[in-house]
Amino acid sequence: MARIAGINIPDHKHTVIALTSIFGIGKTRSQAICAATEIAENVKISELSEEQIDKLRDEVAKFVVEGDLRREVTLSIKRLMDLGTYRGLRHRRGLPVRGQRTKTNARTRKGPRKPIKK
């Protein structure tokens, strides 16, 4: 297994799909990485040479991924909550943040129904 950005990349998958296992790299960005490193998208990771894997590592290192990205997102949400913004309050209460309706639906965000006590 190749190790890129601290993640074990699955050998049996094509390069584009395997790179998406890194947090912060989606399909579009993985296609751009393959184009920049001149590696075919349909080649499996196990078929790549060590030099090609090093090229992939160098290209992925240019982006904010994995732990740094997770920390950035967490700090951004914490900042909103500390400022007391509307979005921060919605995060704190565990409700939808982007204007979705909550009279019905939003069960994923709100959690299971709580029975009304009589």
From Swiss-Prot:
Protein name (record): Small ribosomal subunit protein uS13
CC annotations in GO: cytosol; small ribosomal subunit
InterPro entries recorded: Rbsml_uS13_C, Ribosomal_uS13, Ribosomal_uS13-like_H2TH, Ribosomal_uS13_bac-type, Ribosomal_uS13_CS
Stretch list, region Disordered: 91-118
HAMAP family, alphabetized: Ribosomal_uS13
Subunit (UniProt): Part of the 30S ribosomal subunit. Forms a loose heterodimer with protein S19. Forms two bridges to the 50S subunit in the 70S ribosome.
Similarity field: Belongs to the universal ribosomal protein uS13 family.
Residues spanning the signal sequence: none
Pfam families in the record: Ribosomal_S13
Entry keyword annotation includes tRNA-binding: yes
GO process annotations (BP): translation
GO molecular function, one term: rRNA binding
Function: Located at the top of the head of the 30S subunit, it contacts several helices of the 16S rRNA. In the 70S ribosome it contacts the 23S rRNA (bridge B1a) and protein L5 of the 50S subunit (bridge B1b), connecting the 2 subunits; these bridges are implicated in subunit movement. Contacts the tRNAs in the A and P-sites.
Keyword Transport: no
Assigned keywords, A-Z: Ribonucleoprotein, Ribosomal protein, RNA-binding, rRNA-binding, tRNA-binding
